[in-house]
Amino acid sequence: MSAGTNIWRILLVAGCLTLPLSSVRAETNAPAPATFTTPPTSDADRFFTQYAKAVQLVRQNGRQEASVIMDLLWRNLGSSPWFEIALLKHAELNEISNAQVALEDYDVLRKRVENAPYFQGTADRAAVFRAALLGSAMRGTDRIRIQRIRDALETYSTRYHQYPESLAKLAIFNYIDMEDIHNSEGRLFHYTPTGQRFTPAISYHTYVIEPLAPEPFFVSSPKLDGTTQLDDKTRKFAALIRVPGHMDPHRVFEDQTLEGYFVAAVAAGGAIVCTPEHVLVLVAPE
């Protein structure tokens, strides 16, 4: 990544830079056309509109195209939590196809959550959102590191026809960086060489490494049946959400908890629900 891009990301982390959705047009001497006042599009509306498009592309095996949409989206959102959620989803899409970009996204996400005023304080929403986003970023980083370990183990096995006794040996022999054999909290990943043989020295021909399930870009459960605006004066909404084990939807509001899901945000286009470890985006049906 270029120095200019790094500076740009630093400004984003500090909250000193946002990007407009529309491109800048050249000034002309022509009189401005008559315009009609329309309600401004909020970051929440932008997020759910573009995220819904990305979900459709992922369902059609268009992950690369979906990644482009999410990349443009997070770069054009300026407010929390929509910026952070868009960045998280962009990172999740890139874990396999572009791991370095995903790692950079997770790094920016952690710093934003640690510094953005929205996630500070002791209120339930701030605390749950903060824990869920930080946990998602840490697990995403760990998934990438585990995959790097697997790749390094296969390279080692191709050369030596066995697996190493430890991950430390893998790093000492320069098959992987020392940082990548540790998780986000600095703990060495659990690795056990198996398939022991005596040929004549002891060698290992299989291994077990701690699993970490991928984070889904979208979920089918819980399911959002729709949203309703509470009144004409505010932009507050209620959500109708179906949770596993219940036939009927529940009408919920922001800051409520439903069967273990904390309703962190509700807008016209969808809702965000959190568990202590996950951030789930629920899109309103068309």
What are these regions (language model features)?
Residues V58, N94-E95, T141:
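Hydrophobic/aromatic side-chain positions at a characteristic register within alpha-helices
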Residues I202-L230:
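Alpha-helical interface/anchor segments and their boundary "cap" residues
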Residues I10-P20:
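Bacterial N-terminal signal peptides
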Residues V68, Q100-E104, Y118-Q120, D124-R143, ...:
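Extracellular/periplasmic head regions of type IV pilus-like filament subunits
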Residues T41, L73-F83, L109-A132:
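Short solvent-exposed coil/turn linkers within tandem alpha-helical repeat scaffolds
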Residues P40, D45-L72, N76:
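Alpha-helical segment of the N-proximal tetratricopeptide repeat
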